[in-house]
Amino acid sequence: MVEFFKTIDGRITEINEFSEGCWVNMVHPSSDELAQIAKAAEVEEEFVRAALDPEESSRVDTEDEQLLMIVDIPMVEKSSVEDGGQLFSTIPMGIVVAKSAVITVCLEDSIILRSIAEGAVKGVHTALRTRFVFQILLRI
């Protein structure tokens, strides 16, 4: 699944296609989707593919004018009805900062990114790439 978002009139809004200053949220993307987004954003396909390895460790990598950050994010593995507790695990999430966009890639839909996409986080400006990345990281 690939979704495109952009800040329009101070609100995060879903758009239909890639554009300058947008946020691309990819959840369990296909090979074709990875290739299309890598081409549109002019980033290395390996950067957008890196977070799809469940064993990928956290790291930061740079290549030309692009930055890849892999961070582990918590996911609820299962809930225990008996004691009301939850079991958590982590999965990698990739954040690619390109010249014209921020791309997030994850194997599963994350409440962290979903809350941003649904407008629960105030002051989000997708065109301000560094600030937007910090807003994502602060939600983790």
Set out the residue ranges of the language-model regions.
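Peripheral, non-transmembrane regulatory/ligand-interaction domains of membrane transport proteins
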Residues: 1-140
